[in-house]
């Protein structure tokens, strides 16, 4: 029955893969990735300013203002910045479809989107200048609107050559300025017109109007059904091999970051921070140790199984999973597309967010009010992200216990299956050894090989003689680091001229020309056709990997080097 259910879900895989590659959703996701240094930097000052309050220490007003200035001048402008980074990402996607000699200038689209955003989100101040109330997280939806309109208008103009053309004698940089003038002007006029219409009709700016329009949706998303559907989708998509966050994250990005800001404001006012859907909820509650809430799973494989294979997989997966990189257990066990683990893989994240919601709404625990790096270990992320409250420690322990209870019966079933397989192979191998020993004497062959100096190291020789730079891409840069590290270690050990780097898909466009080979981790393998347009244009080799194959390469440096070599032989 479980196999039939998985087969039905897999029928929708092509549609969801296409959805994950949607250029607008990808632009939102990549726009946030580009702005992440700003988001994380600002959170440092929140922690310094307000965590001491828990221990009875409060900064004086002057010092608090000093500590909050970096936050207000960075996170307070995040929507303004995201308008530009989202426009840049969308421009890259449109440029793939345009001739290489007639490309959209991404710097110009970034500037136009940011200027257009100011028309839609800022109000004039009485003493000159403009107000910034909607330039932070409240203006994120408007930032996306500005970015999308900007790039669509630029694409329309550039594709149809609706630009000012200069004589060939004019330097290219000057010609580009005039080429951008018409689309830039068109964007500003369109967005300014929209601003005038909304202000005259509804007596508010566009950002405020959009926020009011989506407010019922934000409220519904924070409810029991909302969190179940949203966060259950993360695991459900990943289980059938589709990177769930690529689909779900862009759809809820504006809500998660707006709620973080709202929770912080509530805490500042001495009130209860009760917004459930936040970036912290996603990273440290729902994906507690990675998608599927797998923090406890490697430890369970290591300590609660009898199979040698399962114990080895657990040991190899513990460290990366502890830091949120759970592909070694996802594809090594495997958990994904494994009928035995379908129920716990989807159920554990949902139960986790239900428990968190109970802690917040019934026990009065504060929700997340600080953005932290996604690689922060789950328990530590819960404690730090919610302000070091007592309930956060209790919650972290509770989630660990509950997730063990959810996974345990299914793990025992799976371990029993693997044990039976191991026993079968053991008997088969024993019979085979006896037959070989009875019919062949390998001692003579072994002595000849030893005398000739043939060793394992000789077999590890590589045909790669020129410096080869390899870029490994995944969704966030964590999983890709596993393979990049394996390649670098093996290259150093066997003296092969290979250098590997890890990166996140979406942040690769400006650096890919420095590499001879790009390898896609399973998370982003569905983007193969899109990135191939770029690699073909630049003369770069491109390879994609499957789950178990990728994990094998991360654990076997020689195999990883062989994989690199094969890409240049094909």
UniProtKB/Swiss-Prot annotation:
One of its GO terms (biological process) is phosphoenolpyruvate-dependent sugar phosphotransferase system. The keyword Transferase applies. It holds the Pfam family PTS_IIB. The modification Phosphocysteine is found at residue 474. Its EC number is 2.7.1.207. GO terms for cellular component: plasma membrane. CDD domains: PTS_IIB_lactose. It is found in: Cell membrane. InterPro entries: LacE (IPR004801), PTS_EIIB-like_sf (IPR036095), PTS_EIIB_2/3 (IPR003501), PTS_EIIB_3 (IPR013012), PTS_EIIC (IPR003352), PTS_EIIC_3 (IPR004501), PTS_IIB (IPR041713), PTS_Sugar-EIIC/EIIB (IPR051088). It is a multi-pass membrane protein. Residues 467-570 form the PTS EIIB type-3 domain. Induction: Induced by lactose, galactose and galactose-6-P. Repressed by glucose. This is PTS system lactose-specific EIICB component. It comes from Staphylococcus aureus (strain COL).
């Amino acid at each position: 029955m479980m196999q039939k259910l998985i087969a039905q879900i897999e029928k929708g895989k092509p549609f969801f893969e296409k959805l994950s590659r949607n250029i607008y959703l990808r632009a939102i996701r990549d726009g946030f990735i580009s702005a992440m240094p700003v988001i994380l930097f600002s959170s440092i000052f929140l922690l310094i300013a307000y965590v001491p309050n828990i221990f009875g220490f409060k900064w004086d007003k002057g010092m608090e203002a000093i500590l909050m200035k970096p936050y207000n001048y960075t996170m307070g402008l995040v929507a303004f910045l995201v308008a530009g980074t989202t426009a840049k990402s969308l421009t890259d996607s449109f440029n793939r479809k345009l001739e290489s000699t007639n490309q959209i200038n991404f710097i110009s689209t970034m500037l136009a989107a940011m200027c257009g955003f100011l028309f839609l989100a800022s109000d004039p101040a009485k003493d000159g200048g403009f107000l910034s109330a909607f330039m932070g997280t409240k203006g994120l939806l408007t930032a996306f609107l500005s970015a999308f309109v900007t790039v669509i208008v630029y694409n329309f103009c550039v594709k149809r050559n609706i630009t000012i053309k200069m004589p060939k004698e004019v330097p290219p940089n000057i010609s580009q300025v005039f080429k951008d003038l018409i689309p830039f002007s068109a964007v500003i006029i369109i967005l300014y017109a929209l601003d005038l219409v909304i202000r005259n009709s509804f007596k508010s700016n566009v950002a405020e109007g959009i926020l009011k329009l989506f407010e019922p949706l934000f409220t519904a998303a924070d409810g029991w059904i909302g969190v179940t559907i949203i966060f259950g989708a993360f695991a459900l998509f990943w289980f059938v091999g589709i990177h769930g966050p690529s689909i779900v994250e862009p759809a809820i990005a504006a809500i998660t970051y707006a709620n973080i800001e709202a929770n912080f404001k509530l805490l500042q006012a001495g009130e209860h921070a009760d917004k459930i859907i936040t970036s912290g909820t996603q990273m440290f509650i729902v994906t507690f140790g990675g998608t599927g809430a797998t923090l406890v799973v490697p430890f369970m494989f290591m300590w609660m199984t009898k199979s040698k294979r399962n114990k080895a997989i657990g040991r190899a997966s513990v460290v990366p999973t502890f830091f949120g990189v759970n592909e070694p257990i996802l594809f090594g066990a495997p958990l994904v597309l494994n009928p035995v683990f379908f129920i716990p893989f989807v159920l554990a994240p949902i139960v986790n967010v239900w428990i968190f919601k109970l802690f917040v709404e019934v026990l009065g625990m504060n929700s997340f009010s600080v953005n932290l790096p996604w690689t922060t270990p789950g328990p530590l992320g819960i404690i730090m992200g919610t302000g070091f409250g007592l309930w956060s420690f209790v919650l972290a322990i509770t989630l660990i216990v509950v997730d063990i209870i959810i996974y345990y019966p299914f793990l025992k079933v799976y371990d029993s299956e693997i044990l039976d397989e191991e026993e079968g192979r053991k008997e088969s191998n024993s019979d085979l050894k006896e037959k070989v020993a009875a019919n062949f004497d390998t001692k003579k062959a072994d002595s000849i090989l030893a005398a000739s100096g043939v060793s394992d190291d000789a077999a590890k020789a590589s045909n790669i003689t020129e410096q080869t730079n390899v870029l490994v891409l995944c969704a966030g840069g964590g999983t890709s680091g596993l393979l990049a590290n394996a390649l670098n270690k093996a290259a150093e050990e066997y003296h092969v001229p290979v250098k590997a780097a890890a990166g996140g898909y979406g942040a690769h466009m400006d650096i890919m020309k420095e590499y001879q080979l790009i390898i896609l981790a399973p998370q982003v393998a569905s983007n193969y056709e899109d990135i191939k347009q770029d690699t073909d244009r630049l003369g770069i080799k491109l390879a994609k990997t499957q789950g178990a194959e990728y994990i094998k390469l991360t654990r076997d440096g020689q195999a990883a080097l062989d994989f690199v070599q094969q890409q240049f032989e094909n």
